[in-house]
Amino acid sequence: MEVLASSSLSPISFTKPNKINPNFSIQVKLWVKQPPKISKASKFSYARSRSNISRSNAANPGVVFVCNRFLCVIERNDQRKLSGKVMMKSSVNFRQNLSVALVRIVSVLLVSSISVVTTDSPPSWGLTEENLLFLEAWRTIDRAYIDKTFNGQSWFRYRETALRNEPMNTREETYMAIKKMVATLDDPFTRFLEPGKFKSLRSGTQGAVTGVGLSIGYPTASDGPPAGLVVISAAPGGPANRAGILPGDVIQGIDNTTTETLTIYDAAQMLQGPEGSAVELAIRSGPETRLLTLTRERVSVNPVKSRLCELPGSGSNSPKIGYIKLTTFNQNASSAVREAIETLRGNNVNAFVLDLRDNSGGSFPEGIEIAKFWLDKGVIVYICDSRGVRDIYDTDGSNAIATSEPLAVLVNKGTASASEILAGALKDNKRALVYGEPTYGKGKIQSVFELSDGSGLAVTVARYETPAHTDIDKVGVTPDHPLPKSFPKDEEAFCGCLKDPTAACYLNQGLLFSR
């Protein structure tokens, strides 16, 4: 007979007699790595008796003894019913050959194990400092990214190809290689941040922003043609304020990039940058357009503005509305909102307005804490990954401070991320009515990772669903009622609007503060 051997692991099955109970046998399968060649096996015939195997009776071959360089196999050729099994008898030679085979098997398994372990290792050639930084970025995404198909590509193969083909001789070339890698994910929120931008982003979530001190939003019909982004406010004493930029001015360009197609999320990133760096703005004030070059600096940001507004009435019995404008979710946001609520409740407010228009988000934990102020119980948000719900954020009411007063939440297409979580939680728990237009639809959650050279990665690690299990990504939170385009955009204008019963803030008055 011929045995066709290959370089792969080949199965050899045999049945081992059970000496304790002859009526039962043990089926054994060995995987033997055979050499890549064809070898002739020896063939011997033996007579078969119940007591022994005789070599002298060749005329009645009951057993065929087949050997190759690894194993000797005894096949029964008699007509007794054997259920198709091949019986193995051990002999001195067989035991010796079996021992050799087992040694080879162990060697093969050891080699195979080593191969498996080293599959995830970088290529064997020498790695430079730039290569190692690229690998650090690759590993960060590999471990944290929500989509484990990596946009349908082989993430391991991309690593090997990039290390072989992408130039990484300088830090700038390495940054470019990392950006190209991130771009293959086709995720606008997973992005690479050079050291200056990473530092600016981190400081922005800590209550201070290295920028020009502007709060921006989308234009409304009352602002005229949508030819850019509108200035909501300029931080007192900040670069924009000192340059004479006023609320209502339109930003038409940032560093030679038109803002007509920019989201406020992208524009906010462009306005921030390393302290001391310059940014050029094209500002339209009325009919005049100015080009201003501003120097970025650290600007303290108070994320909350609030005001107690009285409706026309009879003196101290006039209904009072507490207006809270939340512009961002930095690490001061929850404490500032708590302080505003407690101050307004101390003045016996009858209802609240929480204005989240043009709030592009920020710190996820701050959004969760603020939701707890308004809810006596319930789910705030579900955190989901590719396998389903991963975590649940809820409240038992222990942090609630304003659960009884009617609440209206104002949103628009500039309401994104953490502010959408807050609006969705208050809506789905029937705590508030939501007014405005569908929100931005940023239903993904990012974590920020610092790399060894001070640069960083913002990586999408999860998505969220509202308490009603609504996935708002690219769809947004749908409001309960529309809001007039001319509705006031800040606390002073809102209080002034309430003094005029014919103004926009009196439209839907029967609904605005109802539960």
Swiss-Prot record:
The active site is at S417, K442. The keyword Metal-binding does not apply. GO terms for cellular component: chloroplast thylakoid lumen; mitochondrion; thylakoid; thylakoid lumen. Coiled coil: none annotated. InterPro entries: ClpP/crotonase-like_dom_sf, PDZ, PDZ_6, PDZ_sf, Peptidase_S41A, Tail-specific_protease. Pfam families: PDZ_6, Peptidase_S41. This is Carboxyl-terminal-processing peptidase 2, chloroplastic. The lineage of its organism: Eukaryota, Viridiplantae, Streptophyta, Embryophyta, Tracheophyta.
